[in-house]
């Protein structure tokens, strides 16, 4: 299986290479720190070389620095170099800090999260002018907070480049803090993270003491945090503002570079199907199918979802697409806990469906699909395949495992490794086999091609 399109070097761990423990040509071997610095310098040269050759801005902490340092459309060589720079820098920090500073660094990260939460709650991001500066005294008055507390927390945030102090007694936006106001996607994610995710993370121990062995989706850290027996989706659906915020956050994640639908387009040989019918199970309002329809004119689509989503999706597709696209896309009301009504489709697509569900429910969902497969049908599962420890870069692995933990905290679910996916297939039907697993470069998700053996 391709994990993320990046070679991890000769030792297969964390993207670094070594020069051997016994030296080369009589020279002493480089220390782990020297190897990391060597890799850092090499990949920094590659990254900066690309940026300079294309007259692109180099990474900077200045207020007008770009939000994204490297376009996701940049060539793979530049993308790999950036990831390796990040990986080497992270490992250098961890290596030089050593075990003695571990707890100090952990608590620093916790404080950054709480400062983000505090700043969001008291509207500090919005009250600081986007241009120029404001005194701590005036800002504290506008926010209704104590000036000393504001100054203490702001200056801690500045150690992580959140805000800046251009002169004593005054605060201004940094590139990062400004982006968390002006970029709607980042702003929504900030509010979601600080109002929902932060209390959920803090309630994990409480949940596991209260329900030590439960995998029920309504007995997770989310339920402990908000003192509810409802599943997360049910709970937020009763709060219109929170539900709308969640929808915007999901849209932002779905359109982020590592979740971009271009990876769905490139992750399977769609053109090789010729004229074919695709059933998108839980396909929402049709973003995936539109992208595929634009690239492959021989494909026709049925998008299945719950009634109000189907109603909205049908309108959106008709209003926002040419007839050549819209006429090839149909909508159908469907509950994936019932038997699949479309029999013998060429493709059954389930994109980001299973990570919300535990093993038993995932088996039920897939079984209902498999019962309607034809002998030549494919089930395409596009979801996370968690890598084996140490087989991808540290910067990628910690994000992937953070998502895995997040699924547990919100739903008592998980992101699965390859063995976890195989276990689901075996529980559904022993005839099922994985035909291929493809992880397009730059994608967090993999396309798992499942067929009847």
UniProtKB/Swiss-Prot annotation:
One of its GO terms (molecular function) is O-methyltransferase activity. Keywords: Methyltransferase, S-adenosyl-L-methionine, Transferase. Induction: Expression is repressed by glutamine and at alkaline ambient pH and highly induced under nitrogen starvation and acidic pH conditions. O-methyltransferase; part of the gene cluster that mediates the biosynthesis of bikaverin, a red pigment also considered as a mycotoxin. The first stage is catalyzed by the polyketide synthase bik1, which catalyzes the formation of the intermediate SMA76a also knowm as pre-bikaverin. FAD-dependent monooxygenase bik2 might then be responsible for the oxidation of pre-bikaverin to oxo-pre-bikaverin which is in turn methylated by the O-methyltransferase bik3 to me-oxo-pre-bikaverin. Disruption phenotype: Impairs the production of bikaverin. Leads to the accumulation of the intermediate oxo-pre-bikaverin. The active site is at residue 355. Pathway: Secondary metabolite biosynthesis. The gene is bik3. It holds the Pfam family Methyltransf_2. Its EC number is 2.1.1.-. Residues 8-25 have a biased composition (Low complexity). This is O-methyltransferase bik3. Belongs to the class I-like SAM-binding methyltransferase superfamily. Cation-independent O-methyltransferase family. COMT subfamily.
């Amino acid at each position: 299986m391709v994990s993320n399109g990046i070679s991890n070097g000769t030792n297969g761990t964390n993207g670094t290479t070594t020069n051997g423990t016994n030296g080369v040509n009589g020279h002493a071997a480089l220390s782990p720190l020297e190897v990391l610095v060597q890799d850092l310098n090499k990949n920094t040269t590659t990254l900066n070389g690309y940026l300079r050759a294309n007259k692109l801005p180099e990474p900077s902490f200045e207020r007008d620095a770009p939000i994204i340092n490297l376009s996701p459309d940049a060539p793979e060589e530049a993308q790999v170099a950036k990831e390796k720079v990040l990986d080497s820098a992270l490992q250098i920090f961890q290596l030089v800090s050593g075990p003695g500073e571990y707890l100090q660094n952990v608590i620093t990260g916790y404080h950054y999260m709480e400062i983000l939460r505090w700043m969001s709650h008291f509207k500090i991001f919005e009250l600081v002018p986007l241009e120029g500066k404001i005194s701590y005294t005036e800002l504290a008055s506008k926010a209704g907070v104590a000036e000393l507390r504001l100054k203490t927390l702001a200056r801690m945030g500045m150690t992580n480049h959140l805000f800046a102090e251009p002169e004593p007694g005054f605060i201004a936006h940094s590139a990062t803090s400004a982006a968390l106001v002006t970029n709607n996607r980042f702003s929504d994610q900030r509010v979601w993270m600080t109002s929902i995710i932060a209390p959920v993370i803090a309630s994990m121990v409480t949940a596991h003491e209260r329900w030590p062995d439960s995998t029920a989706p309504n007995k997770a850290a989310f339920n402990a945090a908000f003192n509810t027996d409802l599943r997360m989706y049910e709970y937020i659906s009763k709060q219109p503002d929170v539900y709308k915020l969640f929808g915007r956050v999901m849209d932002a994640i779905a359109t982020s570079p590592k979740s971009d639908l271009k990876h769905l387009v490139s992750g399977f040989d769609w053109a090789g199907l010729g004229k074919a019918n695709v059933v998108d199970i839980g396909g929402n309002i049709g973003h995936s199918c539109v992208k595929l329809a634009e690239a492959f004119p021989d494909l026709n689509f049925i998008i299945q979802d719950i009634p109000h989503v189907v109603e909205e999706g049908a309108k959106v597709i008709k209003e926002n697409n040419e007839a050549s696209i819209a006429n090839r896309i149909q909508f159908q009301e469907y509950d994936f806990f019932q038997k699949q009504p479309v029999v013998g489709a060429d493709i059954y697509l389930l994109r980001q469906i299973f990570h919300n569900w535990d093993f038993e429910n995932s088996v039920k969902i897939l079984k209902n699909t498999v019962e309607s497969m034809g002998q030549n049908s494919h089930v395409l599962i596009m979801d996370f395949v968690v890598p084996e420890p140490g087989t991808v870069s540290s910067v990628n692995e910690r994000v992937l495992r953070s998502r895995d933990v997040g699924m547990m905290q919100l739903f008592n679910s998980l992101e699965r490794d390859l063995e976890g996916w195989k276990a689901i297939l075996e529980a559904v039907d022993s005839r099922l086999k994985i035909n291929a697993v493809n992880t397009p470069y730059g994608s967090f998700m993999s396309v798992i091609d499942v067929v009847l053996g």
